[in-house]
Amino acid sequence: MSSLSGKVQTVLGLVEPSKLGRTLTHEHLAMTFDCCYCPPPPCQEAISKEPIVMKNLYWIQKNAYSHKENLQLNQETEAIKEELLYFKANGGGALVENTTTGISRDTQTLKRLAEETGVHIISGAGFYVDATHSSETRAMSVEQLTDVLMNEILHGADGTSIKCGIIGEIGCSWPLTESERKVLQATAHAQAQLGCPVIIHPGRSSRAPFQIIRILQEAGADISKTVMSHLDRTILDKKELLEFAQLGCYLEYDLFGTELLHYQLGPDIDMPDDNKRIRRVRLLVEEGCEDRILVAHDIHTKTRLMKYGGHGYSHILTNVVPKMLLRGITENVLDKILIENPKQWLTFK
């Protein structure tokens, strides 16, 4: 049993799980996302280089990955601080920051934000998708990768003494690469030793979550302490979703606020809107999965911040929750989704 057993590890240290309150389990506060830059068509190249102002805001919102400035969330720390204070004023208590190695994790900024806002912030250990892996990462053995993950939780990340409280988001592509497979195996090994929470970013195929769970299981992971992110863009078929739900992991709908005609990172995917997400959450509740549902926004670009006319980190609490109540999801179930389920997941075994 780990010395962390029964606690949640935030960037400010260990806290009692009961202190968290309403928790968003998949967000970003300080990161860069250049790895997913999508060059615009030649006829739109000029607007892609303009600053973020009202006249081009709609274009940037709909072409988020074709505007380089939009991908630099780490430039907006003061705006994010204001948003976290607003989140807290609207009943928020904690936020899981999913930025890992490869997309500019900054634990020192996370610590400062936690100190200045009073929001509990949990940082993620590990590696993002293969496209961000360094040659050193690719050369590591599973054992060496396991050591890295454990060190970031037990001793500190980014050359600091600030410790991560989860492993993830662990990035997976489709098809999965050999380097990503090793990271998944290392994740399972570290989790088996530490009893820590794990969260996964699956590739953009409905088969990806199934494959990932199988690899984790074979390597000794605790699936009951593991979250599968981005189900709203990954498993769209109802029958397939219910089949996946039987595998026992947490089921995360974490793109609330994202409503797109064209999803740049997966052009074949018809991105659902928030009403569809709510219907999926209600379906999972009706099927007896209410103890394993999590929700978030996965904010990772500037134009999703309130400063730039976006929905911000309080959208679920201020807009989505009232609509969920209207659609028959009870207060008790919402407390499970927002408080109890995150608490259970984030608590070390």
Swiss-Prot record:
Keywords: Cytoplasm, Hydrolase, Metal-binding
GO MF term (any one): N-acetyltaurine hydrolase activity
The UniProt record lists the keyword Flavoprotein: no
Cell compartments where the protein resides: Cytoplasm, Cytosol
Keyword Transcription regulation: no
A GO term from the CC aspect: cytosol
InterPro entries: AryldialkylPase_Zn-BS (IPR017947), Metal_Hydrolase (IPR032466), Phosphotriesterase (IPR001559)
Predominant location: cytoplasm
Domain of life: Eukaryota
Reaction(s) catalysed by this chain's protein: N-acetyltaurine + H2O = taurine + acetate; N-propanoyltaurine + H2O = propanoate + taurine; N-acetyl-L-methionine + H2O = L-methionine + acetate; N-acetyl-L-isoleucine + H2O = L-isoleucine + acetate
Gene3D superfamilies in UniProt: Metal-dependent hydrolases
GO terms of biological process kind: catabolic process; epithelial cell differentiation; regulation of appetite; taurine metabolic process
EC number assigned by the record: 3.1.-.-
UniProt-listed SUPFAM superfamilies: Metallo-dependent hydrolases
Binding site for a divalent metal cation 1: 26, 28, 169, 298
Top EC class, one word: hydrolase
Cofactor(s) needed by this chain: a divalent metal cation
Details of cofactor binding: Binds 2 divalent metal cations per subunit.
List of residues binding a divalent metal cation 2: 169, 201, 230
Family: Belongs to the metallo-dependent hydrolases superfamily. Phosphotriesterase family.
Function of the protein: N-acetyltaurine hydrolase that regulates feeding by catalyzing the hydrolysis of N-acetyltaurine into taurine and acetate. N-acetyltaurine has anorexigenic and anti-obesity effects that are dependent on GFRAL receptor and GDF15. PTER also acts on other N-acetyl amino acids (Met, Ile, Leu, Val) and N-propionyltaurine, but at lower rates.
This protein's name: N-acetyltaurine hydrolase
Organism expressing this protein natively: Homo sapiens (Human)
Gene: PTER
